[in-house]
Amino acid sequence: TQLISVEPSYPYAAGRIFYLQTHICDWKDYHATVAFLRQGIAQQQAVISPFEFFNVPASPHEQLMCAESYVLKNYPAQSTPLWNGEIYQHAKIKIAYISADFYNHATSILMIELFEQHDRSQFEIIALAFNSKNDEMTVRVKAAFDRYIDVSQYTDLQVAQLIKSLQIDIAVDLKGHTQDARLGIFAYKAAPIQVNYLGQASTIGASYIDYILADRHIVPPQYHTDFSEKVVCLPHTYYVNDSKRPISSQVFSRGELGLPESGFVFCCFNNSYKISPTMFDVWMRLLQQVPNSVLWLLEGNAT
């Protein structure tokens, strides 16, 4: 807030403040701030990043405008791409999965069995990890790949050069604009095909990302034009999961969880920044209409 008072146009500060306020459900001036941010996006101003704008009530086209403007200002396509149209003569298609989340993180928890189930007779799969965290999930991830390369100390250009030297056919970005993302790697266009998958189920807004893997639920056909990528819809759902993940046998009582012994329990275990005042208003009216009901929320922070 002090920064805004000194330099009102400081890049992305307004969006960051809004994002932090939503983490603690501080909805003071919420609608006025939303209007300000949407106006800024319409005028191609650097008011909010795509990830933070994702939770602003806005149209898919506005999301695209925000992403494209952000990428153009921060991660523009390099003037000379590293891949120049070469056709690799591989016996197997080489796929590189690129992420900071090859540890006990939602991405690996969901994707681990996909890595393990790749048809090795047709594909060679390589992990490029730009986070050096290691845990029991990392051990399983490493075993699932043909090659696992720690690139946490590499620059974006060095990672891109590695992709080119490995003759990767398909580079899959598992981060998008989320935390620890390194979109600058893909700006060098080191692979013939570059794909947006899982980490961010919205457009990256970059001309050098060719496809997004989605489904008809998260990207209905009428919104395909609001993506800079070509939308590839998987059947049923784009979501993967791990069938080997054990399900706990422990059964909790309502009392152990701090819930009343009777009455309907409404639940939302999303992070608090995803809750809007409009949504919360609906919940409150539901509680009024359902006698003895309660709302169970995830406590993301003590505030």
Language model feature labels by segment:
Residues 20, 271-272, 297-302:
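Conserved short loop/turn motifs at secondary-structure junctions
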Residues 1-259, 271, 281:
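Alpha-helical solenoid repeat scaffolds of the TPR/TPR-like class and their adjacent stem/linker regions
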Residues 104-106, 274-276, 298:
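A generic structural signal for short coil/turn motifs at secondary-structure boundaries
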